[in-house]
């Protein structure tokens, strides 16, 4: 992408952009919530649509001159409904957090009881964390994973639902490496008369092409981000049945947002168009193959993986078993060009600023073209560094091996 105007007008900002571009090219990106969008998506997001205010919805705007952005928003809505087989879609949420907020705003009153997954067990801030609006406004009761299997205990979810009678049950996670059984959650919700919402932000790209059970047939509401495994711009969306259209639309605008970001919605439309292409199914399948290949090597190297493996795009490593903290492990890997994030693990005794684990995912490296053999090499590098975080010879060798992989799979070549 050329930056002729920026090079003349604002070299300081351009330097930051180019430095980040260089970092993305030189590093192996394993943050599970990140991905690399196509250049077409970036072009749409950097278009003249950034100039247009468009409060309201297609055909019902509060501003004139919206006839063209109406077309773009309709394309985005139609495509995402086709992808997931949904009756209704709202593509205006600026983020997944705001998509969740809009659903809560639609069906809950402050103080209502909600059942959500514990953040340290793999949930999300917006699923009831006490430092988040969700935990402040609503009475969240937490469920989690068992100590022995480290997977969701559906009977425990059921017992908590029977005891607390929540108005809403939330499923979905930000650091859970196993497939979630949405049909079981639906049964529990029906048993206690609760609404059921799924936040599929992390797995949406897998769901889109049948690589994970779809929540759409089971949930009253489905929310997602549009980046991560969907490989679109940063943003959010909501899916539901047609009956909720008016209430959900009002909750998004004017309920929690003003004007939509039309340039981002255009980028969402482009990304959704890419998801509808046959190549995307191959991509999603490769994400899982890469995650499994990475897990196999790490397990063979003696690195403990939460739940013993993965069914999706991410792995959660318990680095405490190697005598490290997540903070130390993240820094050690970053030094050799592998980007991860420290992450709490179930029943963690460390603070969220230190943690006992790191989270790694394969969406971004898969977008670069990494295959199973590449991931085996990545796994070997990770294991070597985590076992010898202070060994300069090991780190020098790791840097060379990382460079060989990033040179083999250039970004935006």
UniProtKB/Swiss-Prot annotation:
(6S)-5,6,7,8-tetrahydrofolate binds at residues 119, 123-125, 351-353. One of its GO terms (molecular function) is pyridoxal phosphate binding. Keywords: Amino-acid biosynthesis, Cytoplasm, One-carbon metabolism, Pyridoxal phosphate, Transferase. Pathway: One-carbon metabolism; tetrahydrofolate interconversion; Amino-acid biosynthesis; glycine biosynthesis; glycine from L-serine: step 1/1. InterPro entries: PyrdxlP-dep_Trfase, PyrdxlP-dep_Trfase_major, PyrdxlP-dep_Trfase_small, Ser_HO-MeTrfase, Ser_HO-MeTrfase-like, Ser_HO-MeTrfase_PLP_BS, SHMT-like_dom. Pfam families: SHMT. Its EC number is 2.1.2.1. The modification N6-(pyridoxal phosphate)lysine is found at residue 228. One of its GO terms (cellular component) is cytosol. It comes from the Bacteria. It is an enzyme of class 2 (transferase). PANTHER family: SERINE HYDROXYMETHYLTRANSFERASE (PTHR11680), SERINE HYDROXYMETHYLTRANSFERASE 1 (PTHR11680:SF35). This is Serine hydroxymethyltransferase. The gene is glyA.
């Amino acid at each position: 992408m050329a930056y002729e105007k920026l090079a003349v007008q604002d070299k300081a900002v351009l330097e930051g952009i180019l430095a980040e571009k260089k970092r993305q090219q030189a590093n192996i990106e394993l943050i599970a919530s990140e991905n690399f969008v196509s250049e077409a998506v970036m072009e749409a997001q950097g278009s003249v649509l950034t100039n247009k205010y468009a409060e309201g919805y297609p055909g019902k705007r509060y501003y004139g001159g919206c006839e063209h952005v109406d077309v773009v928003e309709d394309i985005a809505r139609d495509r995402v409904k086709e992808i997931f087989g949904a009756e209704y879609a709202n593509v205006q949420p600026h983020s997944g957090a705001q998509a969740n907020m809009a659903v809560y705003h639609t069906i809950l009153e402050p103080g209502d009881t909600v059942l959500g997954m514990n953040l340290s067990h793999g949930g999300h801030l917006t699923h009831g964390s006490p430092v988040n609006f969700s935990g402040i406004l609503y009475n969240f009761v937490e469920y989690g994973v068992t100590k022995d299997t480290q997977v969701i205990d559906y009977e425990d979810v059921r017992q908590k639902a029977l005891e607390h009678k929540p108005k809403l049950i939330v499923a979905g996670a930000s650091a859970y490496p196993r497939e979630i059984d949405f049909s079981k959650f639906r049964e529990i919700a029906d048993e206690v008369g609760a609404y059921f919402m799924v936040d599929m932000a992390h797995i949406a790209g897998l769901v889109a092409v049948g690589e994970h059970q779809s929540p759409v047939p089971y949930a009253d509401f489905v929310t997602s981000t549009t980046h991560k495994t969907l490989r679109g711009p940063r943003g959010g969306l909501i899916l539901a049945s047609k009956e909720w259209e008016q209430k959900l639309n009002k909750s998004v605008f004017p309920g929690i947002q003003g004007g939509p970001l039309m340039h981002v919605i255009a980028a969402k439309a482009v990304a959704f168009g890419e998801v509808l292409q046959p190549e995307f199914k191959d991509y999603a399948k490769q994400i899982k193959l890469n995650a499994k290949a990475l897990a196999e090597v790490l397990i063979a190297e003696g690195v403990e993986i939460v739940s013993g493996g993965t069914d999706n795009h991410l792995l959660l490593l318990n680095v405490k078993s190697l005598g490290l903290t997540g903070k130390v492990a993240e820094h050690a890997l970053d030094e050799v060009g592998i980007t991860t994030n420290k992450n709490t693990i179930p029943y963690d005794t460390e603070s969220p600023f230190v943690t006992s684990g790191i989270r790694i995912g394969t969406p971004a490296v898969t977008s670069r073209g990494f295959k199973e053999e590449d991931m085996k090499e990545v796994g070997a590098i990770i294991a070597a560094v985590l076992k010898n975080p202070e060994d300069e010879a090991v780190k020098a060798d790791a840097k060379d091996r990382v460079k060989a992989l990033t040179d083999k799979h250039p970004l935006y070549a």
